[in-house]
């Protein structure tokens, strides 16, 4: 279907990949992985013809229908959500217009063979592209991605950025192309929408090539992984978990080969040094010098090693960390109406519990966390923090407090008091800020880097109740693993909202489900909750 052969691409003096090759066949689901800046998005753009390679080729049939979902959705306006999705394929619009024109000509008595043949061709193509059921498909996909039927006819301008991303994703899916490129499709989706998308893609007969920070999503779909890293493209025949294990095995084998080669080279060099001045060995020395010149050195690229950082032990809180008694919350809408978020919420969160707060988008998860954190008042009832409880709170808005003019190190120094420079550098290293990274200005950091910076400072301050609202947003898989390990070692209580199932499965001891204006508590892990709920 798509053959990439000997691909080389560079920007300025930086080589992204050299002589990289891989193949994606019909119906294959393939993951694309690699560190930030390795060239994942560039590879998508090369396939789409939006960028040119330095050398090599990307070959596929001209008739192949390809769609590309990227994080840059452009400006959406002038249509309803449903109309935007229906108009995702301009060719369908053209065909519909031409068919209408021909049908009008037929009504006027023009029955020429040429016109009838053209009508037949247009109708065949229109049907092949799904034109006759596109509205049904568009509505089904929008609903699956969490935009309910009552919102289908709302103007796209009325949706927030995250919901516009869903509309843009729906535009791609509803076209049912033969090949889909997807750059982080699970961003901004809740768990229910991610599960729906995973099921949809699993039954999709076309090929998919995608990046995703959601490990469970990748594991559930892909059977092949393409890695871009260290200027090379490497293919692994398995899901994400297989890729991680196989990558480690291959690296160990490479290190062993490199060590054997180094031992051999050292012996040869010792021989050359020992006999270089002896005329009787001149031929042998010359032969071995030539041999060494021809040997291609095995290069083992440096890997970021995990940093063992011991977070400070928080002060002990009382056993009852959070108490809620008939808590309710009502908001005033822009139209001046009252909107109830939840009511009658009662419960106690005990010390050392790790509670996942779950529910569909708009159910009130973030509002519940804000009420508990004291950032907004309950309209009814009472939410109380227990004795000796100190709160650390994180949300996507926490990043707004960062000073864009300061460096990463300066931000940490200002927020982590009475600690040495070495301590702060180790802290930053544990959150993947290493070497020159600590001197980066906050203004140039990505969303994921800003999240890591804030989380690092929260975890090293003496709080014993962490309230985390979507801490995994913008974090890649490696950063999420770093955060999981940090939270596992945290000797306090955690309330957390996240749409990453793998992340929640590793952490939680209790689940609070916000649904239909109430909250239900389920003892046990997130995996046990999913089993009860019939989830994935």
List PLM regions with ranges.
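ABC ATP-binding cassette signature C-motif
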Residues: 1-258, 305, 314-536
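Conserved short loop/turn motifs at secondary-structure junctions
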Residues: 157, 275-278, 312
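Intracellular alpha-helical coupling/juxtamembrane segments of multi-pass membrane proteins
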Residues: 246-302
């Amino acid at each position: 279907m798509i053959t990439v052969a000997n691909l080389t691409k560079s920007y300025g003096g930086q080589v992204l990949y050299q002589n990289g090759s891989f193949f994606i066949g019909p119906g294959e689901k393939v993951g694309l992985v690699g560190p930030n800046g390795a060239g994942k998005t560039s590879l998508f753009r090369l396939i789409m013809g939006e960028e040119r390679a330095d050398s090599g080729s990307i070959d596929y049939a001209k008739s192949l229908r390809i769609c590309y979902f990227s994080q840059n959705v452009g400006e959406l306006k002038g249509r309803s959500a449903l109309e935007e999705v229906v108009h995702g394929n301009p060719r369908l619009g053209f065909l519909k217009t031409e068919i209408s024109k021909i049908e009008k000509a037929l009504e006027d008595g023009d029955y020429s063979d040429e016109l009838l043949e053209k009508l037949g061709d247009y109708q065949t193509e229109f049907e092949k592209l799904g034109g006759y059921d596109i509205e049904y498909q568009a509505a089904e996909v929008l609903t699956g991605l969490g935009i309910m039927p009552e919102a289908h006819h709302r103007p796209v301008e009325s949706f927030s950025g995250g919901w516009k991303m869903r509309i843009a994703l729906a535009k791609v899916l509803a076209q049912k192309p033969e090949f889909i490129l997807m750059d982080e499709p699970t961003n901004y989706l809740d768990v229910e929408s991610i599960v729906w998308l995973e099921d949809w893609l699993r039954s999709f007969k076309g090929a998919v090539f995608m990046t995703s920070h959601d490990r469970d999503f990748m594991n559930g779909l892909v059977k092949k992984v393409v890695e871009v890293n260290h200027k090379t493209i490497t293919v692994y025949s398995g899901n994400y978990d297989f890729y991680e294990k196989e990558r480690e095995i291959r690296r160990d084998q490479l290190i062993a080969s490199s060590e054997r080669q180094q031992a051999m080279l050292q012996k040869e060099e010792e021989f050359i040094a020992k006999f270089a001045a002896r005329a009787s060995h001149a031929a042998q020395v010359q032969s071995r010098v030539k041999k060494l010149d021809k040997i291609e050195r095995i290069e083992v690229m440096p890997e970021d090693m995990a940093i063992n950082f011991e977070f400070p032990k928080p002060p002990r809180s009382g056993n009852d960390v959070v108490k809620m008694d008939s808590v309710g919350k009502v908001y005033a809408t822009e139209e001046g109406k009252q909107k109830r978020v939840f009511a009658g919420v009662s419960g106690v969160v005990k010390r050392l519990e790790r509670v996942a707060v779950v529910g569909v988008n708009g159910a009130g998860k973030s509002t519940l966390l804000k009420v508990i954190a004291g950032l907004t008042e309950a309209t009814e009832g009472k939410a109380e923090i227990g004795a000796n409880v100190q709160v650390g709170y994180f949300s996507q808005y926490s990043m707004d407090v960062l000073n864009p003019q300061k460096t990463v190190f300066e931000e940490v120094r200002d927020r982590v008091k009475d600690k040495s420079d070495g301590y702060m550098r180790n802290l930053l290293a544990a959150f993947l800020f290493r070497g020159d990274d600590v001197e980066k200005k906050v203004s140039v950091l990505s969303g994921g880097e800003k999240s890591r910076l804030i989380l690092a400072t929260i975890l090293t301050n003496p709080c014993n109740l962490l309230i985390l609202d979507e801490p995994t947003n913008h974090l890649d898989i490696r950063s999420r693993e770093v955060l999981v390990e940090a939270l596992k070692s945290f000797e306090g209580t955690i309330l957390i909202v996240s749409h990453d199932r793998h992340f929640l499965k590793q952490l939680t001891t209790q689940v609070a489900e916000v649904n239909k204006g109430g909250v239900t508590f389920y003892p046990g892990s997130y995996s046990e909750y999913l089993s009860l709920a019939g989830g994935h």
